[in-house]
């Protein structure tokens, strides 16, 4: 068996419908689109959510919620990602240098996902209870 001899099981692949190629094909002339009307024409279809002029559902329902602007400058860091950082001190600047967060991020929180394999000192970052326990178990410490 070689890659160039592989083929799908018989009946697995259906031939593409070729429309507008004579009445004997069953898809000639109008090509399965019927006669006239919006949907028979090229580019002819109503946009998603259009209900024929009736007030659409997404407009009938009330608006709610908002996007917190502080979430745009906040990042979440996994414990396992701390292993990629050179050195033993972890703060916002070292996270940016390691490429774990973008330059616009101003605050970050470390949460317990994976495991940290080296002793690190966390400075100026929020840390969950589980992550703090894991960092201290690995010989590191968390400073405010």
From Swiss-Prot:
GO MF: rRNA binding; structural constituent of ribosome
Record bears the keyword Nucleotide-binding: no
Gene Ontology process terms (BP): translation
Pfam families, sorted: Ribosomal_L27A
Keywords: Ribonucleoprotein, Ribosomal protein, RNA-binding, rRNA-binding
Family recorded in the similarity comment: Belongs to the universal ribosomal protein uL15 family.
InterPro entries registered for this protein in UniProt: Ribosomal_uL15, Ribosomal_uL15/eL18, Ribosomal_uL15/eL18_sf, Ribosomal_uL15_bac-type
Protein role: Binds to the 23S rRNA.
Spans traversing the lipid bilayer: none
GO cellular component: cytosolic large ribosomal subunit
Protein species of origin: Cellvibrio japonicus (strain Ueda107)
Self-association and partners: Part of the 50S ribosomal subunit.
Protein name: Large ribosomal subunit protein uL15
Positions of the UniProt region annotated as Disordered: 24-52
Alphabetical list of Gene3D superfamilies matching this protein: 3.100.10.10
């Amino acid at each position: 068996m070689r890659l160039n001899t592989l083929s799908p099981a018989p009946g697995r692949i259906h031939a593409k419908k070729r429309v507008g190629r004579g009445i004997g094909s069953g898809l000639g002339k109008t090509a399965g689109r019927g006669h006239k009307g919006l949907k028979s024409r090229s580019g002819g279809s109503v946009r998603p959510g259009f209900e024929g002029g009736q007030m659409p559902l997404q407009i009938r329902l009330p608006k709610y919620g908002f996007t917190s602007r502080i979430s745009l400058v906040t990042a979440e860091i996994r414990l396992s990602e701390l292993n990629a950082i050179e050195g033993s001190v972890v703060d916002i600047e070292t996270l940016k240098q390691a490429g774990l967060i973008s330059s616009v991020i101003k605050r970050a929180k470390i949460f317990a996902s994976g495991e940290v394999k080296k002793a690190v000192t966390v400075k100026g970052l929020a840390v969950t209870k589980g992550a703090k326990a894991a960092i201290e178990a690995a010989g590191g410490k968390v400073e405010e």
